[in-house]
From Swiss-Prot:
Belongs to the IspG family. Converts 2C-methyl-D-erythritol 2,4-cyclodiphosphate (ME-2,4cPP) into 1-hydroxy-2-methyl-2-(E)-butenyl 4-diphosphate. This is 4-hydroxy-3-methylbut-2-en-1-yl diphosphate synthase (flavodoxin). Binds 1 [4Fe-4S] cluster. It comes from the Bacteria. NCBIfam families: ispG_gcpE (TIGR00612), PRK00366.1 (NF001540). Pfam families: GcpE.
Length: 372
């Protein structure tokens, strides 16, 4: 029930990664990358499907050799989500995965060979309508830029990116997006700000090598949150040294927190104190796990007492306000019922699922009416 975010998105061109629109006001796509051996087709397919189940719009797969390219062919045949092939150094791998139906190529034109080889890759991408992502990283800047600037700086990342952009411009290829990632939040943020002023292509956001599940999520939330709040960014990846599934969850949590894009339940919960009338922490933790399958956007407030509970419930899809033995249940801001504190988790799960079904049905009817 909260209003949409007052964010003015940066204007950009649009490309398509498979059937997923990127840029020009399209929903910000959330993506991840497999961390299996690509030659282990079964493990890679299983991981991609797990990512798809939690909402991944796009998945990137590393393809460092021709053996992985052959495995990519088999993987592509068994999944539905668009796949990006991550390729460095060998232009022939790019040509091979293009033949196998890749949805996007992640390359740096400067590291796959001479001008003729770059032209071959770009011509192939153009012929097959495959977009390219230019991926600049502070950890792999060109040697001359390292010498020129002494260390990675926003200006160095921008100069590297613009070299690659110029490569594609000279070849009259416009179907690309760009990233300028760094593990330092301020370096990444300022690099993206500079780049956003220079080009109108879509930007892929990320804080690279952000860290483990907790610290990486925090760094990504700060860095990506700053950029997204300024309207910068058309697709994102949260890079974690963790299960890639967590990257998707954190990515959507960042977008939900900024009210940019919603998927699933946005839980609003108090940190608890001695006033709580039921086990708020246990309830929230249990419901987050039980309700991972719900993709319907909903705000659910779970507050342990009457200090802030009623106010939060007024602006939530469903809200619980702690009371003695029984707690008040609100639906769309209206008090509807009371729930037994000793059976809170099961009761609230049932109410949330019922509300999700009701909202899904209402949307289905609306779509049918529009189509008529």
């Amino acid at each position: 029930m909260h209003n949409q975010a007052p964010i003015q998105r940066r204007k950009s061109t649009r490309i398509y990664v498979g059937n997923v629109p990127i840029g020009d006001g399209a929903p910000i796509a959330v993506q991840s990358m497999t961390n299996t051996r690509t030659t282990d087709v079964e493990a890679t397919v299983n991981q991609i499907k797990a990512l798809e189940r939690v909402g991944a719009d796009i998945v990137r797969v590393s393809v460092p050799t021709m053996d992985e390219a052959e495995a990519f062919k088999l993987i592509k045949q068994r999944v539905n989500v668009p796949l990006v092939a991550d390729i460095h150094f060998d232009y022939r791998i790019a040509l091979k995965v293009a033949e196998y139906g890749v949805d996007c190529l992640r390359i740096n034109p400067g590291n796959i060979g001479n001008e003729e080889r770059i032209r071959m890759v770009v011509d192939c991408a153009r012929d097959k309508n495959i977009p390219i992502r230019i991926g600049v990283n502070a950890g792999s800047l060109e040697k001359d830029l390292q010498e020129k600037y002494g260390e990675p700086t926003p200006q160095a990342l921008l100069e590297s990116a613009m070299r690659h952009v110029d490569h594609l411009d000279r070849l009259n290829f416009a179907q690309f997006k760009v990233s300028v990632k760094a593990s330092d939040v301020f370096l990444a943020v300022e690099s993206y700000r500079l780049l956003a002023k220079q080009i109108d292509q879509p930007l892929h956001l990320g804080i690279t090598e952000a860290g483990g599940a907790r610290s990486g999520a925090v760094k990504s939330a700060i860095g990506l949150g700053l950029l997204l709040s300024e309207g910068i960014g058309d697709t994102l990846r949260v890079s974690l040294a963790a299960d890639p599934v967590e990257e998707i969850k954190v990515g959507f949590d960042i977008l939900k927190s900024l009210r940019i894009r919603s998927r699933g339940i946005n839980f609003i919960a108090c940190p608890t104190c001695s006033r709580q009338e039921f086990d708020v922490i246990g309830t929230v933790n249990a419901l987050e796990q039980r309700l991972e399958d719900i993709i319907t956007p909903m705000d659910v407030s779970i507050i342990g007492c009457v200090v802030n509970g009623p106010g939060e419930a007024l602006v939530s899809t469903l809200g619980v306000t702690g009371g003695n033995k029984k707690s008040g249940l609100y639906e769309d801001g209206v008090r509807k019922d009371r729930l037994d504190n000793n059976d809170m988790i099961d009761q609230l799960e049932a109410r949330i699922r019922a509300k999700a079904s009701q909202l899904d049905e209402a949307r289905r009817i609306d779509v049918q009416q529009v189509e008529k």
